[in-house]
Amino acid sequence: LYDIASRTKTTATLLAVMKLYDEGKFGLTDPISKYVPVLQGSKKGKITIEDLLYHQSGLPGSWPFYREAIDDSSYVGSFFKARIDANHHLRVDNRLYVVDDFRYKKEYLSTASSNEFPLQVADNLFVNLEFPKRILEMIASDEIPLRDRRYRYSCLNFVLLKEMVEQISKMPMDQYLEKEFYGPMGMESTLYNPLRRFEREQIVPTIQKDYLRNRKELRGYVHDEIAAFMGGVSGNAGLFSNARDVAKVYQMLVDGGQYGGKRYLSLETCQLFMNKKSRISRRGLGFDKPDSALGKGPCADEAPMEVVGHTGFTGTCAWADPKNGLVFVFISNRIYPRPFDHKGLMTLNIRPRIQQLMYQALKD
């Protein structure tokens, strides 16, 4: 199993959104505050579901919510520094080093599981139920800026969509997905928090030394910090899977909502979400798509504009091509052992080059 990072957006959250839309539970032009009460009265309350899906909400790309849980009095100097020094030895990115030692606030995290701290972040690290609520409160507040509605890819959009799914379905999103999709489709290797079902050795490690969680190898816990501090289940990241299971989802989309003789989504809903496109970016409704400018997008140059899918930071991608009846899934752990050594997959253009071979094979 692999941490599929932002491909959670289309392999999990978007499926739930499409299902609820199929059932007439919301409209694309509805304000998100209609379904997420914490946003009522907030400037963000007028953001529409369509804005979130197109990444045109005005919200920033991400936010370091985990800093709210860190006791600032527990370390000397700044948390990050641009160069190594006596208190900052662990490199986490190019010209970025993290403080050697710090503590979490006791009101938010504990080293032992309990009724008060039930959400596991890592080995011997648990967060309470209040912190995910605090994340939503911070999104609603003026602390997180709201800018113009141009295209700006944001994980926060899908954090809010997950909250909407849970408010409408009256179920935790991971349970809703298991009930409506993963269980019936035989996707036994697709789930959040995989250590609840699988042995550690069955899960590919993500990074060698995680600076937020005990400075140990991260295996079986989501890499994304937002998802981690929400207990592993978020709309932007958190899902673990393998290529075979992911291919089932995208084959279902290629086949207009059907898989294995069972209908999961209506043809009309599949066509709407897979064909509708933003007027100001290449984005579809929740999906990424090819760019009309050759060499600029995430897909092979020969991929038709009908293709939909998504990539993930940990080194994954999945693309459904309904025009040619093709599904392409690529999974890797490119940020292992160190997250700042991940550029090769992109600079070598490996994923689009493999996809290009598929289209060349069609011609041959």
Task: Give the label of every model feature segment.
Residues 17, 249-250, 358:
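Hydrophobic "lid"/C-terminal helical patch
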Residues 44-305:
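Short, surface-exposed loop or secondary-structure junction motifs
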Residues 1-54, 144-157, 234-237:
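Short active-site loop at a secondary-structure junction
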Residues 1-4, 25-27, 136-140, 144, ...:
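Short, conserved catalytic-motif segment at the N-terminal edge
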